């Protein structure tokens, strides 16, 4: 329970809710058991004095912040060890501590050990042979070695074929000789690389018998196991301060004639024999499995970012009173302004839809991964395309949504104590890492153009793109009646036509004599538009299917709330793409006006439950870390308390006055 009395406006909002917030909290957590596990983890980690901050981390130097973050990361790691020993750890525990809300509460600027668990270990599991897993995994799980994943370079990121780091096989010693041949070949950005990890999975061009074989992952020791000094041939360090994720210890890595044994190349999918003979993978896409795994996880992370930002902004908007609506009445809660509602409520709805979609994509990834393990690669392209476009769309929308929430809080949202700067810095980073968003959309678009050609040839398409075949057989969209189902179908029809245009434009360029790659570049805007609408059509379909299904499983009161969430999401999404709808569907001015009035009505129906909905995200005050968004709603008191922690305010007269200002003021005398 909060130590201070709850702000009366906030308490009034909670008392008039039409549903039980705990019911939704359990749903959001994934069920009663996971909800209880979440509470237990919060008690274990958030009540530990060693994991609390006396001084806001925004006042720390870059060096101090790293040391502070590493200290906490090691405490977390020790607790994870104990949970593993007690058999109480699981995927949800790692998700919560490394990418979820609990981890962000403890390590607000990121965890320097995160990539060890999120990338290094999964890469060994996904790309190492059974023998290699036996050799490396126990050491990694027990943190006898600390690893990271070194793929991105100073000169190349998402374009993997452009990576310059090179590994040449020396058959005489059965070793690989790894080099970064230029400055642009230096590995750049891996989390924990700067001063934390002593091993890395290094992705490099593979050469055997003088021939280029493609990219391959190698386990490379970076630092001495005892002294932690860089190994011979290793040039390594931290890349410096950034917009966000300031505690992650992103690093750089140069390699000069670094030799690693043959068995240090992860060989589950491709092999090099002792004599240098190369055995190619069954499918080159298999080597990208780790990135697909992370992209799927990131979709759920974007939902958490929106949940945090919308919780802070909604609670603040219930407490803040300003700008009379009726001149004869007192200043209202700013959440009563329709324009404020339009800023906030769609972000809450997106958080719920992104979480629902993220859970579905995660389940889909696990199913398809099982199929891949059995040698069935049929659905791999579909999974790759979906994970790419959804990662791009959800991260972009989440970053924009966080910024919208910040702006909705006026000047106070600009303060560090609001926590918006940190949330935004962490969220916008997702737009770049694990595949820059534009490139991700282009990856999806290539798949869409391919399946469009298959549909023209009468081939049966997988369910997530079957709407393309439907649109080919239906040249005109009929019966847009404004129902939620018709909005979903309209999204699919618009998406199919966007893909049609991209396909036709590429074919036109080919007929003009351009090669496939040049044609694709010339048609880049058509391609990204097609991928964007494909992802949004998938989100609309998933929201419609899953939220209606959930509404049949919960209480009637919560069911009504979920239906309002769904309607708000779909109507808002439709109006945000109304130009595309008007292009491909015969909508009248009256149809659009009806949608706009309907959006206004959705906001009104959403309003009574807004605070209780964000309460249902069940975000601990330590997770929010915001003077504006605390559960008790005492915004101004929390803001003022934050100023008292400012080191500048610890002395009545700062020394700089006597050193600089006073001589300056007296200089004219």
From Swiss-Prot:
Belongs to the acyl-CoA oxidase family. It is found in: Peroxisome; Nucleus. It is an enzyme of class 1 (oxidoreductase). One of its GO terms (molecular function) is acyl-CoA oxidase activity. A motif (Microbody targeting signal) lies at residues 667-669. Pfam families: ACOX, ACOX_C_alpha1, Acyl-CoA_dh_M, Acyl-CoA_ox_N. The modification Phosphoserine is found at residue 551. The keyword Secreted does not apply. Homodimer. One of its GO terms (cellular component) is peroxisome. Catalyzes the desaturation of acyl-CoAs to 2-trans-enoyl-CoAs. First enzyme of the fatty acid beta-oxidation pathway. Expressed in glia. Its EC number is 1.3.3.6. Pathway: Lipid metabolism; peroxisomal fatty acid beta-oxidation. Its cofactor is FAD. One of its GO terms (biological process) is very long-chain fatty acid beta-oxidation. The keyword Acetylation does not apply. It catalyses: a 2,3-saturated acyl-CoA + O2 = a (2E)-enoyl-CoA + H2O2. Disruption phenotype: Most mutants die as pupae. They have increased VLCFA, loss of vision and have glial loss and reduced neuronal survival. The modification Phosphotyrosine is found at residue 544. Gene3D superfamilies: Acyl-CoA dehydrogenase/oxidase, N-terminal domain, Butyryl-CoA Dehydrogenase, subunit A, domain 2, Butyryl-CoA Dehydrogenase, subunit A, domain 3. The active site is at 434 (proton acceptor). FAD binds at residues 152, 191. This is Acyl-coenzyme A oxidase 1.
């Amino acid at each position: 329970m909060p130590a201070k009395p709850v702000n009366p406006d906030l308490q009034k909002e909670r008392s008039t809710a039409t549903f039980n917030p705990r019911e939704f909290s359990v749903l959001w957590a994934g069920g009663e058991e996971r909800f209880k596990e979440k509470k237990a983890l919060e008690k274990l980690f958030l009540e530990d004095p060693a994991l609390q901050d006396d001084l806001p981390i925004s006042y720390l130097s870059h060096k101090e912040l790293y040391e502070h973050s590493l200290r906490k990361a090691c405490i977390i790691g020790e607790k994870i060890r104990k949970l593993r020993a007690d058999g109480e750890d699981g995927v949800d525990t790692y998700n919560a501590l490394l990418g979820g809300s609990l981890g962000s509460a403890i390590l607000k600027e990121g965890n320097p050990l995160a990539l060890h668990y999120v990338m290094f270990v999964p890469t060994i599991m996904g790309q190492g042979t059974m023998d290699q897993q036996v050799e490396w995994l126990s050491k990694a799980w027990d943190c006898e070695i600390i690893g990271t994943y070194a793929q991105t370079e100073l000169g190349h990121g998402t374009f993997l074929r452009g990576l310059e780091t090179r590994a040449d096989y020396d058959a005489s010693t059965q070793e690989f000789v790894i080099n970064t041949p230029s400055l642009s070949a230096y590995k750049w950005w891996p989390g924990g690389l700067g001063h934390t990890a002593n091993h890395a999975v290094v992705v490099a061009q593979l050469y055997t018998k003088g021939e280029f074989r493609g990219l391959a992952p190698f386990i490379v020791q970076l630092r001495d196991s005892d002294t932690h000094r860089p190994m011979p041939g290793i040039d390594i360090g931290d890349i410096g301060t950034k917009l966000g994720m300031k505690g992650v210890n992103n690093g750089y890595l140069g390699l000069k004639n670094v030799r690693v044994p043959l068995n240090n190349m992860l060989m589950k999918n491709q092999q090099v024999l002792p004599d240098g003979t190369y055995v190619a993978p069954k499918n080159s896409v298999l080597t990208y499995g780790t990135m697909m795994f992370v992209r799927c996880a990131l979709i759920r992370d974007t939902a958490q970012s929106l949940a945090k930002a919308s919780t802070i902004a909604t609670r603040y908007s219930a407490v803040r009173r300003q700008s009379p609506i009726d001149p004869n009445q007192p200043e209202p809660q700013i959440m009563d302004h329709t324009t404020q509602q339009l800023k906030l409520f769609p972000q809450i709805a997106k958080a719920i839809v992104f979480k629902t979609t993220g859970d579905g994509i995660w389940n889909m990834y696990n199913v398809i991964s099982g199929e891949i393990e059995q040698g069935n690669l049929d659905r791999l392209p579909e999974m790759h395309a979906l994970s790419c476009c959804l990662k791009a769309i959800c991260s972009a929308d989440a970053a924009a949504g966080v910024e919208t929430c910040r702006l909705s809080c006026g000047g106070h949202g600009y303060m560090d104590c609001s926590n918006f700067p940190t949330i935004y810095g962490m969220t916008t980073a997702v737009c770049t890492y694990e595949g820059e968003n534009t490139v991700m959309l282009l990856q999806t678009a290539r798949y869409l153009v391919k399946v469009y050609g298959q549909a023209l040839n009468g081939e049966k398409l997988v369910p997530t793109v079957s709407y393309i075949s439907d649109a080919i057989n239906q040249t005109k969209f009929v019966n847009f009646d404004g129902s939620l189902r018709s909005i979903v179908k309209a999204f699919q029809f618009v998406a199919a036509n966007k893909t049609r245009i991209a396909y036709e434009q590429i074919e036109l360029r080919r007929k003009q004599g351009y090669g496939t790659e040049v044609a694709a570049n010339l048609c880049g805007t058509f391609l990204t538009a097609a991928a964007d609408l494909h992802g949004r059509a998938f989100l609309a379909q998933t929201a419609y299917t899953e939220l209606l299904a959930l509404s049949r499983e919960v209480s009637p009161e919560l069911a009504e709330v979920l239906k309002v969430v769904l309607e708000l999401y779909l109507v808002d999404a439709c109006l945000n793409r109304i130009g595309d709808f008007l292009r491909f569907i015969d909508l009248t001015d009256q149809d659009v006006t009806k949608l706009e009035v309907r959006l206004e009505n959705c906001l009104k129906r959403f309003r009574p439950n807004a605070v209780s909905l964000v309460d249902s995200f069940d975000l601990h005050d330590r997770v929010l870390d915001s003077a504006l968004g605390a559960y008790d709603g005492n915004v101004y008191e929390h803001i003022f308390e934050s100023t008292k922690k400012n080191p500048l305010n610890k002395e009545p007269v700062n020394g700089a006055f006597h050193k600089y200002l006073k001589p300056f003021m007296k200089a004219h005398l």
